[in-house]
Amino acid sequence: MQTVVGGAITAAAAAGAGAGLWWYAAMWPQSQIFGPQLIAGRDPMEAALTFDDGPNGDTTLRLLDILAEHDAQATFFLIGDCVRQQPQIARRVAEAGHLIGNHSMTHPVLAWQSAARIREELSGCNAIFEDVIGAKARYFRPPHGARRPAVLRTARELGMTPVLWNVTAFDWNPISAEEIAGNIDRGIATNRRKGRGSNILLHDGGHMGLGQPRMPSLSATAQVLAKARAGGMRFVTVDAWG
């Protein structure tokens, strides 16, 4: 009996460890277990501002104004369905010289989806981009950061480089601009100590639909741009890194 129980405990422990490793590989933004993904460059004085889940009406337009005031370029990972609903704003993002990336058509957790659904989400988003801005995306960020080998393989088959991040603003939570900026500042400081660039995850929209309140994110962006530039930080788009 002890042998049977002990074997069951060992099997359960192994299964738990395997599940934990799979979750880490699928959800931790800096994990490379499922294959190479672009995170950031090696210059600790470089940072990329990346914005997910847009376009989002006046919020995205105000963000474009803030970036222009600071002469900064950013990377926008747009949801295809939001682009379909607000094509004129997506075009404004592209016309301002920012880099546009694919964030899927409807923002599902792709790690749990079938291979057919994954391809539909990514190719559908790129088809919308071609119609609206005249070009497919060359970079892809999985919604929620959730991926598995099939997600990364499909992105590459469609000519896109998967991109994650190494600074999380946590701005999807109802927190203040000061808290968001503090999260970013701490993330940049950590990366600088480690001798690497910073890929900053922010949001100008939300996957629940248009009209998501993101003004604290915009205010935090202005704060970070002013402070980082004063300290010699250079802002790039993710294509500068690969």
Predicted regions and their residues:
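A short acidic, helix-capping loop that chelates divalent metal ions and anchors anionic groups
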Residues: 108-113, 207-211
